[in-house]
């Protein structure tokens, strides 16, 4: 399929629909794309195009996800929708589709259901910063008091998982009516209200290049007469010749200065997020740096060994384990570019974890890794992926 030229004139924001099965996530996704395409241009997408989600792989895990794009007057949105509950769990944990904000779809006829709760918890655990609520199927509920009751329940649920329930925008409408072009308050106008909430409630995310410099170490070379060159892809920020950096993870943190930046064998004065570069480090020996460490702006990221995480364990069909694992299971944790062994502590009420489950765990690594909340990792056994996770909270 030919890729059209990407016009990046507006700020770009990543969003997605979450919520209980059959509450109307896919219908709403189709309605947003269709209604906004009429008003602001872009491609209308039908329900069938979105429901038929293509398979993709993230960290060795197969996930079905639909990607839709739409625009408002001020922004360009990339929106992800998943057909099944398991796909949501995998998507959110692997970060296959990082969300700057989520649209929680809740049926006014049913109120919050088990997956409504689970998706809010997942959003909290994996670091989705903002949630907007679309109260769907309002055309099926005549009773204003019932609508207010459902709205109150949703706000309480958001509060329970540390989202600001009282301040969360809740838009009432009917995705089905909107998709059919209905002009009543619950139809197309509800979608435009939702778009306005997206524009105003979710702040424009910081671009990778504006962050504090971070580059995972992929390879280390010794170049005679010049010193040690470390290669990798800059994850965020900018690095300029002459700047001081830290080498963090696995062993004690070291400070050094970047004396050269090269890309494709050409010398540059700086490297930035997305660039594959080689950095020449002053006075650093080849054996002082190894894969799995990171180079970073001094003080911007610290090494840690002890944290809680939300993980998804691959099923047997996905190439995962065939048997459950128990407390004190010791796999490898693959962070960025390397494996580190660690032990897993299960929640008190969980005796074991079955393939295909998702679970909150506590991990202790044998070596420290440069870590922040929201960092993704894979769980591996002898080089094959058996799970995926995200750091929820750092303990030490």
Swiss-Prot record:
GO terms for cellular component: cytosol. GTP binds at residues 19-26, 81-85, 136-139. It comes from the Bacteria. Residues 19-26 are annotated as: G1. Coiled coil: none annotated. Pfam families: GTP_EFTU, GTP_EFTU_D2, GTP_EFTU_D3. Residues 136-139 are annotated as: G4. Residues 81-84 are annotated as: G3. Residues 60-64 are annotated as: G2. It is found in: Cytoplasm. Its EC number is 3.6.5.3. Residues 10-206 form the tr-type G domain. GO terms for molecular function: GTP binding; GTPase activity; guanosine tetraphosphate binding; translation elongation factor activity. Signal peptide: none annotated. It catalyses: GTP + H2O = GDP + phosphate + H(+). PROSITE patterns: G_TR_1, G_TR_2. It is an enzyme of class 3 (hydrolase). Mg(2+) binds at residue 26. The keyword Ligase does not apply. InterPro entries: EF-Tu_GTP-bd, EF-Tu_GTPase, EFTu-like_2, EFTU_2, G_TR_CS, P-loop_NTPase, Small_GTP-bd, T_Tr_GTP-bd_dom. Keywords: Cytoplasm, Elongation factor, GTP-binding, Hydrolase, Magnesium, Metal-binding, Nucleotide-binding, Protein biosynthesis. SUPFAM superfamilies: EF-Tu/eEF-1alpha/eIF2-gamma C-terminal domain, P-loop containing nucleoside triphosphate hydrolases, Translation proteins. GTP hydrolase that promotes the GTP-dependent binding of aminoacyl-tRNA to the A-site of ribosomes during protein biosynthesis. Belongs to the TRAFAC class translation factor GTPase superfamily. Classic translation factor GTPase family. EF-Tu/EF-1A subfamily. This is Elongation factor Tu 2. It comes from Acidovorax sp. (strain JS42). The gene is tuf2.
